[in-house]
C-alpha cells in the first residue's frame, strides 16, 4: 500500500507510474556480445542465476531467473524508460500468501553486490512492479525487491467499477498487511540461494510510505532501516479527505479553482507571507506561520475575474486549507493543506476522489459499484468507514518500540507543499510516537522526520525535491540521500540531523543545480542566517521550531 496516491486518465504524472516490463531491447543474446562476453565468469554467472529456477524457496515459485545485461530497457506505461546500468540476475517469482492468493515479486541481484537488501515500494493502490525503483537500487549495488501487492493493475481504480481485491475482506487484509512482508522473506531466501550468504543489512525505501510504516509497526524484524516517503498512515481518512476536497466543485461547478485561479492564489500567498524572497523561490520557508485569508482575493463589483476569485472559489480555497472533522464525533478526519501548496490542488478537486476514494470505498465499505461519492456524509458515512475500513488499512500505530528495541531506524520525509497527503499528519504521528517514547528525544533515538519546504508528494514541487525521491541526489552521501543516511545510522551509529536537498533546473539533473537548501530533522527547521546566497544550503542553519512552525497551527 502505496504511499499516498495520484493517478487518473488525465493525470498520470501525479504518481510514480506503473512500470511494466515490455521486453529487453538488447535481449539475453546480447549479453554474450557485451564487454564481459566469452569469459568463464559469464557462463558461471548465467548458470548460477538460472539455477534459481530449481531453488526451494518457502511458499515461492520462481518463474524466471535470467541474467539481464547492462543497457536493458524497461518501459513505463506512460512511455518513460528505466535502463539498467550493469548486469543483474533478474528473478521473477510468485509468493503464495494464502491458498488462493499470490503476490508477484521481482528480485534483482547485481553481480557486484554490496551485501545489502533494499526493499522498494510503490504508489497508489499498487498492482504492478516498479522497475525504476529496482533499477535505481541495483545500480547502487543493492539486491533489490519489489512486489505487485497481490493483484494486477495500474495503481488506481476506475469510477463505477469495483476493485476485486478490496471487495473481498480477506484479500483486502492481505493487500493491506501482506504486500511487503512475504516478498521480503522470499527475497532474503533468494539472496541466500544466489550469493551463498545472507544480506548483512536490510533497508526499505518507498512511496510506498504506508508500506514502509506497515513494516515498522507490524514486521519490525524485516528491515534494519526504513525510508518512508509522504506516508498517508491514516489511509481511510486520507480517502475521506479526497472526497472533502472534491465535494464542493462536484456540487457547485463554479467553485472549481482553475489553473489560473490557483496560480493567482499561490502568488498572493507567497507575496503576503514571504515577500520577494518567496516569490523568487516559488515557495515558503515556513508555511505554518502563514495566515493568508483567500477572502482578500474575492471579486468586488466591476473586478475582472482574471484578477480575483469568485465567492464560491474563495469558499473552496478555505475548505482546502481547513481541517475536516467527523460531524457526529468531532474527531479530526484530516488536516488542511499548507499555504503555498496551491499549485498542486488540481487533483484534489476531482481526480483523487473519482479514481481512488470512490473505487476503494465503493468496494470495501458500501458494496455498490455505482455508489455516488458526492452523497458522502461526513458524520454517519465517516463513522461507517472508520468502523469497517480503518482497522484494516491504517498504519498509524505510534508504538514502534519493537522496531526501536532491535536497533531499527526510521527516516520519514514529508513535503510542506504536498497536495495529496496533508503535511501536518506526519508531524502528528511523530508527536504520538514521542508521547509513547518518553518525549521527543526518546522518539529521535530511532525516528527522524524531515519536513521539506516547497516539496510536493514524494518529491516534485517548487522546492528542493531530491530527499523525496523524485530526483536523484547530487551524490549518494549521508547528508544528501536518505538511504545512505540510514546506512550511516544503522551501521555506524551516526544519527542524522541536517540534510541538503537539491532543486535541479527544469527538474532535470542533466540541466544542473538550480539551488540547494538545508533540511533539518524535526523539531528543528532550517532558517536563513541573514547573509549569504539563498541558493546555497550553507546559508541556512538548523534552529528549534516553535509550536506554529511545527505544524500545529493549521489543525
PLM feature spans:
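Catalytic-loop region of hydrolases
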Residues: 35-116, 129-132, 280-284, 293-371, ...
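Cap/lid segment of the alpha/beta-hydrolase catalytic domain
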Residues: 114, 123-196, 240-241, 248-251, ...
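Alpha/beta-hydrolase fold nucleophile elbow
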Residues: 197-206
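Glycine-rich nucleophile elbow surrounding the catalytic serine of serine-hydrolase chemistry
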Residues: 206-214
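Short beta-strand/loop motif that positions the catalytic acidic residue
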Residues: 412-414
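Conserved alpha/beta-hydrolase "acid-adjacent" motif
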Residues: 420-424
